[in-house]
């Protein structure tokens, strides 16, 4: 590859394998498929089962839908090795996670005496991370769903290979639409990457298969998508007029309670009143408050700040609900999403990233991903590209090094747009930031308000960890590394390098000493080491200040000094919480930067806050909302549906011991109930635990129960991705997911028929007498919100049917029983033994 019309004629062999495991030296290939792509078309496909190994584990059978009978008459790999080698000859070997498929196939060839060495390797995972920058996950089925590619039977080699081939074609076509300047930049960046992406880009540029720069504006060495402007003034409209238009256009059912909600919210906006409003799930509160806000703006020209809890809800409001209302009134409704400034790409930080030479794969991919994303984004909101782990750390480091310059292009543009919008939308975490930046707005609507307190507490918290601080100092580097120190030395006299290196060595040792003191809970030693670190950093800053090209390294180390000062102040004022105590490298120090009183003071100019939720009232009242309202009066309103969870039954076993993770009988009882469910229904099941210790013990017990041999056990560990586990759970038919509180909310359980979820404990600790008032003010409301969210996993719609098994009798014999169960019909709350549970399952 590289010149002439090679790209036009080049063949790609897209390979996918299904195997009995992940070890290429021990496990076997059970299905192989090769799809040949040429000239952006699929021209051939070869697929076969293989019989080198026919005994399959339950997990492999469930994952692939391949059973032993399909393999019995299939060839062995040695029988087809020559044919496969011929198919691959002269092609670019391509796969989704190419290291896995290439490694397995190369090992299989080797066992047949064939030395397979392709000239080029291409990984569609790597390509997707760069050229599909908005994707959050890169499993093939997730990408296929996002792009609308057909993949009805994931984890079968024939369908996976074809979907990967279609993905490759999509990626190549997208690369060809990029302007030549960007592609040349991507080509130079990609050279150090492990696989042969640079050759593909070179061929595209050489053959002039590129787009133009129309609709783009240049910023230094890169382009940004030019955003189209234009505003129209809204015509005045009452709540009733907007609601009638919405119903007529959408064809939705007219609901008196929904219109009542809209009018109540409009009145609170108009009168500048505080309002706490609980409205049951399904009443349509989002459309109700949007109609109230739009009418309020059209009549009075005043803007409203709306806050909600999750990205998916923000997307629903801005893309789906707003579009329905725009169609109803026949004109666009200006709205803008806004967050804190640090959540938008800092162009100065990006320029710095591009200027630094670094062959680290993650940094290269980050640079390339950002170059592509800037041609697409209208907002510059970093959440669009889901920076995680090293990517996030590298960008944050560059942002610190860039300092407070003029690079906040996207944030400033969002602020300008907010000044002309009907409403500004944010999420709870950034609510206070938006209140700070929008002093003209004095009215706030908080949707999903039961989540607000937790989000604000998270926002007020800064976390210090051993690994993060080591990484931060490591970014300064050594003279031989292409990082900050080497860049500084290249512009200055090298005589000072020994002093700087010595200081960095001491700072690294200082981090070890700080976290050793934290591990030992020795506050005096910790403060001594913090002060020592501050002095070392001051010496470093003094040594570089005023020299040539010192600003980047100075900004970086000055930020580190501020980190140490903040940590020291928190330790002295006892504003911290420690997490972890066994492993030095996993210890975290959570520091509270502000309290709720200071947040209320920052929001002092807000005249009216309307809090909305499906789960807001607790124990007949709203007193727990005083963390936000303080001593200001507020109205309250409940629009309830006594049969909200009418399709969900709650079963509480009466024949199990009290909750005790050290009681073998209690653990055995949980396992027995799980086994009964599996044997009676044959359906998938999710079991949620309050801690990993109990989860691990239950998992250990399942190994001795025969029922579990026919089911895949998905077990969450401290290192597991809950998203990946949920994806596997939704894909499999016969499986059990053992998880923790990370699955309590925001998940979509996919199951045919009745959904079942088992909960080992109500989501709060046993109340302590010494903390009784705090229990009713904080712990109980939070537990009720969590419990209703969990119930909402098994019944998302009125027609759904669900079963919630709760191994916690407190829900029946404590004063707070009705607080948890008020939306469940009494006949749906069942207490019984194992036999009655079997009867319940048979009647589902």
Tell me what each language-model feature is.
Residues 240-244, 302-303, 307-422:
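A substrate-engagement module of RecA-like helicase motors
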Residues 2-7, 170-241:
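Acidic two-metal-ion nuclease catalytic site recognized across multiple nuclease folds
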Residues 315, 323, 400-423, 427-538, ...:
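Signature of the SF2 helicase/ATPase Hel1-core->accessory helical subdomain module
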Residues 231-276:
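Conserved pre-motif I regulatory segment
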Residues 654-665, 717-813:
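Conserved RecA-like P-loop NTPase helicase motor core
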Residues 399-424, 434, 539-666, 715-717, ...:
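A contiguous, basic/glycine-rich beta-loop/short-helix subdomain that forms a polymer-engagement track
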Residues 271-292:
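Walker A/P-loop
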Residues 2-120, 133-155:
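Conserved non-catalytic scaffold segment of RNase H-like nuclease domains
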């Amino acid at each position: 590859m590289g010149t002439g019309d090679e790209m036009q004629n080049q063949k790609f062999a897209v390979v996918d394998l299904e195997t009995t495991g992940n070890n290429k030296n021990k496990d076997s290939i059970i299905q192989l498929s090769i799809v040949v792509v040429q000239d952006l078309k699929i021209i051939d496909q070869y697929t076969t089962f293989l019989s080198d190994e026919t005994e399959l584990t339950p997990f492999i059978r469930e994952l692939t839908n391949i059973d032993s009978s399909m393999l019995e008459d299939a060839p062995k790999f040695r029988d087809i090795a020559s044919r496969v080698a011929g198919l691959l000859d002269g092609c670019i070997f391509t796969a989704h996670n190419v290291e896995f498929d290439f490694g397995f196939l190369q090992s299989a060839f080797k066992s047949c005496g064939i030395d397979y060495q392709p000239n080029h390797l291409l990984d569609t995972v790597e390509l997707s991370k760069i050229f599909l920058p908005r994707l959050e996950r890169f499993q093939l089925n997730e990408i296929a769903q996002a792009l609308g590619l057909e993949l009805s039977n994931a984890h079968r080699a024939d369908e996976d290979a074809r979907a990967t081939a279609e993905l490759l074609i999509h990626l190549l076509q997208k690369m060809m639409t990029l302007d030549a300047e960007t592609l040349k930049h991507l080509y130079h960046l990609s050279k150090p990457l492990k696989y042969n992406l640079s050759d593909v880009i070179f061929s595209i540029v050489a053959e002039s298969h590129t787009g133009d720069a129309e609709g783009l504006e240049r910023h230094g060495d890169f382009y940004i998508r030019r955003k189209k402007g234009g505003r129209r003034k809204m015509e005045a409209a009452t709540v009733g007029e907007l609601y009638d238009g919405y119903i007529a256009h959408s064809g939705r059912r007219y609901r008196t309670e929904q219109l009542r909600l809209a009018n109540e919210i409009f009145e609170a906006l108009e009168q500048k009143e505080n309002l706490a409003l609980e409205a049951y799930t399904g009443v349509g509160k989002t459309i109700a408050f949007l109609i109230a806000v739009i009418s309020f703006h059209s009549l009075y020209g005043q803007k409203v700040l709306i806050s909600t809890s999750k990205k998916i809800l923000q997307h629903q409001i801005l893309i789906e609900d707003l579009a329905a209302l725009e169609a109803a009134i026949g004109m666009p409704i200006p709205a803008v999403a806004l967050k804190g400034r640090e959540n938008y790409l800092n162009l100065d930080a990006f320029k710095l990233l591009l200027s630094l030479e670094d062959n680290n794969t993650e940094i290269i991919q980050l640079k390339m991903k950002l170059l592509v994303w800037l041609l697409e984004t209208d907002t510059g909101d970093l959440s669009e590209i889901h920076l995680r782990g090293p990517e996030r750390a590298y960008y944050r480091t560059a942002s610190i090094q860039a300092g407070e310059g003029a690079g906040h292009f996207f944030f400033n543009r969002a602020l300008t747009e907010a000044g002309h919008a009907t409403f500004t939308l944010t999420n709870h975490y950034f609510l206070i930031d938006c209140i700070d930046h929008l002093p003209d707005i004095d009215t706030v609507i908080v949707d999903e308000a039961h989540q607000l307190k937790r989000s604000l507490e998270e926002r007020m918290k800064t976390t210090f960890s051993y690994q993060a601080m080591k990484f931060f100092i490591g970014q300064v580097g050594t003279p031989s590394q292409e990082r900050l120190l080497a860049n500084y030395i290249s512009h200055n006299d090298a005589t000072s390098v020994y002093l700087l290196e010595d200081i960095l060595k001491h700072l690294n040792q200082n981090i070890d000493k700080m976290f050793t003191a934290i591990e030992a809970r020795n506050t005096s030693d910790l403060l001594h080491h913090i002060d020592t670190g501050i002095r070392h950093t001051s010496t470093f800053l003094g040594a570089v200040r005023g020299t040539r090209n010192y600003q980047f390294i100075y900004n970086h180390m000055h930020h580190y000094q501020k980190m140490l000062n903040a940590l020291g102040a928190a330790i002295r004022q006892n504003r911290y919480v420690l997490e972890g105590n066994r492993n030095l490298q996993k210890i975290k120090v959570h520091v509270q930067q502000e309290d709720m009183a200071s947040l209320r003071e920052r929001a002092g100019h807000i005249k009216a806050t309307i809090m909305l939720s499906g789960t807001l009232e607790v124990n007949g009242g709203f007193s727990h909302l005083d963390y936000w309202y303080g001593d200001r009066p507020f109205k309250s309103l409940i629009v309830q549906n006594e049969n909200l969870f009418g399709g969900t039954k709650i079963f509480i076993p009466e024949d199990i011991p009290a909750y005790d993770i050290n009681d073998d009988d209690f653990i055995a009882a949980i396992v027995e109930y799980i086994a009964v469910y599996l044997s009676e229904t044959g359906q998938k099941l999710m079991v949620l635990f309050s801690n990993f210790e109990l989860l691990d013990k239950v998992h250990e017990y399942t190994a001795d129960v025969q029922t579990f041999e026919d089911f895949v056990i998905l077990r969450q560990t401290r290192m597991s991705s809950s998203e990946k586990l949920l994806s596997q759970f939704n894909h499999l038919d016969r499986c059990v997911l053992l998880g923790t509180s990370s699955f309590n909310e925001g998940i979509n359980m996919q199951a045919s028929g009745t959904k079942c979820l088992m909960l080992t404990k109500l989501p709060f600790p046993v109340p302590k007498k010494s903390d009784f008032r705090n229990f009713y003010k904080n712990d109980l409301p939070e537990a009720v919100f969590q419990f209703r969210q969990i119930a909402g996993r098994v019944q998302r719609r009125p027609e759904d049917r669900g079963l919630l098994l709760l191994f916690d009798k407190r829900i029946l014999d404590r004063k707070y029983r009705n607080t948890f169960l008020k939306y469940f019909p009494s006949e749906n709350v069942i207490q019984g033994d194992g036999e009655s549970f079997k009867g319940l399952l048979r009647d589902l």
